[in-house]
């Protein structure tokens, strides 16, 4: 083995395959772009984003870690969300949960 060498797995790797998923329509009703990162608790995003926040409780974007989705002013798009795993506790963000989901 060489330091830093990577041994990739064979075949396709499916991200979030076993997690509960939901698809929501999201509109940016604001006058500025809103960008949401991959692991942000989607129900607590910017209030300018219009969508079913209760359906998004305990969910995050189903995109690769470290990436984000940008919503331009007036833009409407569908997004797929996946449930948080592990202890299913949410702290920080906008402070609306601060504990178990």
Curated annotation (Swiss-Prot):
SUPFAM superfamilies: Urease, beta-subunit. It catalyses: urea + 2 H2O + H(+) = hydrogencarbonate + 2 NH4(+). GO terms for biological process: urea catabolic process. Pathway: Nitrogen metabolism; urea degradation; CO(2) and NH(3) from urea (urease route): step 1/1. Its EC number is 3.5.1.5. It is an enzyme of class 3 (hydrolase). Gene3D superfamilies: Urease, beta subunit. Keywords: Cytoplasm, Hydrolase. CDD domains: Urease_beta. Pfam families: Urease_beta. One of its GO terms (molecular function) is urease activity. It is found in: Cytoplasm. GO terms for cellular component: urease complex. Its main location: cytoplasm. Belongs to the urease beta subunit family. Heterotrimer of UreA (gamma), UreB (beta) and UreC (alpha) subunits. Three heterotrimers associate to form the active enzyme. This is Urease subunit beta. The lineage of its organism: Bacteria, Pseudomonadati, Pseudomonadota, Alphaproteobacteria, Rhodobacterales. The gene is ureB.
């Amino acid at each position: 083995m060489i330091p830093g060498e990577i041994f990739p797995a064979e075949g396709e790797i499916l991200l979030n395959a076993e997690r509960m998923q939901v698809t929501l329509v999201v509109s940016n009703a604001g006058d500025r772009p809103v960008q949401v990162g991959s692991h942000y608790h989607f129900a607590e995003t910017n209030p300018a984003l219009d969508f079913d926040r209760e359906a998004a409780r305990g969910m995050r974007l189903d995109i690769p870690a470290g990436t984000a989705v940008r919503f331009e002013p007036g833009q409407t798009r569908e997004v797929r969300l996946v449930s948080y795993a592990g202890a299913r506790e949410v702290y920080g963000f906008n402070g609306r949960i601060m504990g178990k989901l």
